[in-house]
Amino acid sequence: MKEMIIWPTYIDSKRTKNEGRKVSKEFAVQSPKLKDIADKINKMGLEYSIENKKSYPREPWEICGYIKVKIEKNASKLQILKEVCKSMK
């Protein structure tokens, strides 16, 4: 197993790729909330933990938190993000 970090910015449709969005606009969701992302990860059956009081490195003034997810070694991080986005739409 390996861990991946999911910042809300990674799937936010309001962000550009330069601002940290990792998925394409077609998959991205508008203003994703940490709790909503956690709910989707839980429904996917993955282990996770939430870190609420952390700020995204490119925006240290904004406390948004992140989710640490345990995934299989051969799992694609981008595919996990896309699955989360699909279930949020």
Swiss-Prot record:
Write down the Gene3D superfamilies for this protein, in alphabetical order.
Signal recognition particle, SRP19-like subunit (3.30.56.30)
Entry GO terms, CC = signal recognition particle
Q: Which UniProt keywords apply?
A: Cytoplasm, Ribonucleoprotein, RNA-binding, Signal recognition particle
Q: Which InterPro entries match?
A: Signal_recog_particle_SRP19 (IPR002778), SRP19-like_sf (IPR036521), SRP19_arc-type (IPR022938)
Where along the sequence do coiled-coil regions lie? none
Q: Which GO terms describe its biological process?
A: SRP-dependent cotranslational protein targeting to membrane, signal sequence recognition
Localization per record? Cytoplasm
Q: Name one Pfam family in it.
A: SRP19
GO MF entries: 7S RNA binding
Could you describe the subunit structure of this protein? Part of the signal recognition particle protein translocation system, which is composed of SRP and FtsY. Archaeal SRP consists of a 7S RNA molecule of 300 nucleotides and two protein subunits: SRP54 and SRP19.
List the PANTHER family hit by this protein, alphabetically. SIGNAL RECOGNITION PARTICLE 19 KD PROTEIN, SIGNAL RECOGNITION PARTICLE 19 KDA PROTEIN
Described purpose of this protein according to its UniProt entry: Involved in targeting and insertion of nascent membrane proteins into the cytoplasmic membrane. Binds directly to 7S RNA and mediates binding of the 54 kDa subunit of the SRP.
Report the family membership.
Belongs to the SRP19 family.
Q: What is this protein called?
A: Signal recognition particle 19 kDa protein
Species source reads Methanococcus maripaludis (strain C6 / ATCC BAA-1332)
Q: Which gene encodes it?
A: srp19
